[in-house]
Amino acid sequence: MIALLNGQLIEKTVSQVILDVGGVGYRLLIPLSTYYALPDEGDVRLRVHTHVREDALLLFGFLTETEKDLFGLLLSVSGVGPKVALNILSHLPAADLQQALSQGNAKHLATVPGIGKKTAERLVLELREKVGPVQAVPGNAPLPAETAGDLREDALSALVNLGYKENLSRKALDGIDTAPDAPLEDILKQALKLLMR
């Protein structure tokens, strides 16, 4: 089983990356959190979950061991496959997911598109004891808080890299109302909603 890949980033889209490792190109499916955190080029290291099916071998890449472990836990729940697990991690940061599971907050889990009330309740029922309380994990500690201006500039850069014009991206960012401590993912989600109208 492949557990870790360290190589040159060849291609990056919102759902997958291609890494060149020793002349071999590996395609890894990724959550949005990994997409936003990866550089556009250069060397990257991803933790890998290898998923084997009868007809395919799928690789899923994560920046942190915590995300990889949560992905594996989500797959252990009946009715949750790789696409659903990746969707959950794309919409909920790892700490939020851990907190929702450990506190039995099925309502918060049901805010993820494609996750209904029954699935959310099943996730809580099967994973609540496995996740335990949220703790700071070495290597996954949050980085120092960025200023709101830095986050806006990062969001602008991400939108331009996605192909949106800079002036339209600035208007979208100016048109959203986010909390001063809102994470980059939330800022981008709201801006993308405006840009897709």
UniProtKB/Swiss-Prot annotation:
<dbReference type="InterPro" id="IPR036267">
    <property type="entry name" value="RuvA_C_sf"/>
</dbReference>
<dbReference type="InterPro" id="IPR013849">
    <property type="entry name" value="DNA_helicase_Holl-junc_RuvA_I"/>
</dbReference>
<feature type="region of interest" description="Domain III">
    <location>
        <begin position="147"/>
        <end position="197"/>
    </location>
</feature>
<dbReference type="GO" id="GO:0048476">
    <property type="term" value="C:Holliday junction resolvase complex"/>
</dbReference>
<dbReference type="InterPro" id="IPR010994">
    <property type="entry name" value="RuvA_2-like"/>
</dbReference>
<protein>
    <recommendedName>
        <fullName>Holliday junction branch migration complex subunit RuvA</fullName>
    </recommendedName>
</protein>
<dbReference type="InterPro" id="IPR011114">
    <property type="entry name" value="RuvA_C"/>
</dbReference>
<keyword id="KW-0227">DNA damage</keyword>
<keyword id="KW-0234">DNA repair</keyword>
<dbReference type="Pfam" id="PF01330">
    <property type="entry name" value="RuvA_N"/>
</dbReference>
<dbReference type="InterPro" id="IPR003583">
    <property type="entry name" value="Hlx-hairpin-Hlx_DNA-bd_motif"/>
</dbReference>
<dbReference type="GO" id="GO:0006281">
    <property type="term" value="P:DNA repair"/>
</dbReference>
<dbReference type="GO" id="GO:0006310">
    <property type="term" value="P:DNA recombination"/>
</dbReference>
<comment type="similarity">
    <text>Belongs to the RuvA family.</text>
</comment>
<dbReference type="GO" id="GO:0005737">
    <property type="term" value="C:cytoplasm"/>
</dbReference>
<comment type="subunit">
    <text>Homotetramer. Forms an RuvA(8)-RuvB(12)-Holliday junction (HJ) complex. HJ DNA is sandwiched between 2 RuvA tetramers; dsDNA enters through RuvA and exits via RuvB. An RuvB hexamer assembles on each DNA strand where it exits the tetramer. Each RuvB hexamer is contacted by two RuvA subunits (via domain III) on 2 adjacent RuvB subunits; this complex drives branch migration. In the full resolvosome a probable DNA-RuvA(4)-RuvB(12)-RuvC(2) complex forms which resolves the HJ.</text>
</comment>
<dbReference type="Pfam" id="PF14520">
    <property type="entry name" value="HHH_5"/>
</dbReference>
<feature type="region of interest" description="Domain I">
    <location>
        <begin position="1"/>
        <end position="63"/>
    </location>
</feature>
<dbReference type="Pfam" id="PF07499">
    <property type="entry name" value="RuvA_C"/>
</dbReference>
<comment type="function">
    <text>The RuvA-RuvB-RuvC complex processes Holliday junction (HJ) DNA during genetic recombination and DNA repair, while the RuvA-RuvB complex plays an important role in the rescue of blocked DNA replication forks via replication fork reversal (RFR). RuvA specifically binds to HJ cruciform DNA, conferring on it an open structure. The RuvB hexamer acts as an ATP-dependent pump, pulling dsDNA into and through the RuvAB complex. HJ branch migration allows RuvC to scan DNA until it finds its consensus sequence, where it cleaves and resolves the cruciform DNA.</text>
</comment>
<dbReference type="GO" id="GO:0005524">
    <property type="term" value="F:ATP binding"/>
</dbReference>
<keyword id="KW-0233">DNA recombination</keyword>
<dbReference type="InterPro" id="IPR012340">
    <property type="entry name" value="NA-bd_OB-fold"/>
</dbReference>
<feature type="region of interest" description="Domain II">
    <location>
        <begin position="64"/>
        <end position="142"/>
    </location>
</feature>
<dbReference type="GO" id="GO:0000400">
    <property type="term" value="F:four-way junction DNA binding"/>
</dbReference>
<feature type="region of interest" description="Flexible linker">
    <location>
        <begin position="142"/>
        <end position="146"/>
    </location>
</feature>
<keyword id="KW-0238">DNA-binding</keyword>
<dbReference type="GO" id="GO:0009379">
    <property type="term" value="C:Holliday junction helicase complex"/>
</dbReference>
<dbReference type="InterPro" id="IPR000085">
    <property type="entry name" value="RuvA"/>
</dbReference>
<dbReference type="GO" id="GO:0009378">
    <property type="term" value="F:four-way junction helicase activity"/>
</dbReference>
<keyword id="KW-0963">Cytoplasm</keyword>
